[in-house]
Amino acid sequence: MTVNLDWENLGFSYMKLPYRYIAYYRNGQWEEGTLTEDATLHISESSPSLHYGQQAFEGLKAYRTKDGSIQLFRPDKNAERLQRTADRLLMPQVPTEMFVDAVKQVVRANEEYVPPYGTGGTLYIRPLLIGVGDIIGVKPAEEYIFTIFVMPVGNYFKGGLTPTNFIVSDDYDRAAPHGTGAAKVGGNYAASLLPGKIAKDKHFSDVIYLDPATHTKIEEVGSANFFGITKNDEFVTPLSPSILPSITKYSLLYLAEHRLGLKPIEGDVPLADLGKFTEAGACGTAAVISPIGGIQHGDDFHVFYSETEVGPVTRKLYDELTGIQFGDVEAPEGWIVKV
């Protein structure tokens, strides 16, 4: 079957594809999952996921390589992160083998929608874990649904990798010091909508959140992780229990050290130390790397490498990681899973 899509101009939006995966957790165990054409979830109106936010999700991609094969990038790490989130919300873990197999099933079932090599497009994969059933009152569900749907998405940067500017939020926190910041739960994203809108209304790309305890250290950039490059060839990124551990960030930390010869550093990133960075960026699944041109904080605006050009180290990191994902660059052992 040939799919007639404008592959070069795909955006990042929902598209209903023929198949998705669904599995039910009942009576203390996971039942065998299945592929279905039904894109609607049928759940009780009193499901804890609707009322109390007992839900978790993931995001990853499938890539078409030059030889036409399809591969995944570190799906086991997404499985492990979903397991940690499930533990935090008293939900049953989805075993890694079950997770990866389910991802493979749904990608294979919709493989004609994986964008061709060279278009920059990918098949975005959204696993979702929700508590369901007739529960009223604040307590964990007894039944759960694990589902995965997919859609083709385009290159995040249509005109090529481009820096954008961000603004520091002094009025809003992304997460509480001992809250759910390290978990990938919907509530964290719902809370980011208002500050994100305020930033965009001021013509910034998104918000930079500070640590919730002291408001002096950089934590996250919108829904992505922050990194900075110093003149001393250091790759620096924040470390905090309220930051979502990005698979992209940890991949970049490894590549920065082992492919580019940089010194990887995880630790506090004081806002007052922005001047030590010659380049900066945000990283995550959607864009891979979003170069940061400048950061506004109060009346101060700090420019890194350039507001219009991507720094050389950021460019090398982006090319190295995307090269691995699309099969053009040799991957570290265990990073690539063929579908």
Language-model region placement:
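Extended, Lys/Arg-enriched charged tracts that mediate electrostatic binding to polyanionic substrates
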Residues: 116-130
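Helix-start/capping segments and mature chain N-termini
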Residues: 1-106, 128, 135-339
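Short glycine-rich, low-complexity/disordered patches
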Residues: 113-120, 330-334
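Charged, gly/pro-rich active-site loop segments
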Residues: 96, 106-118
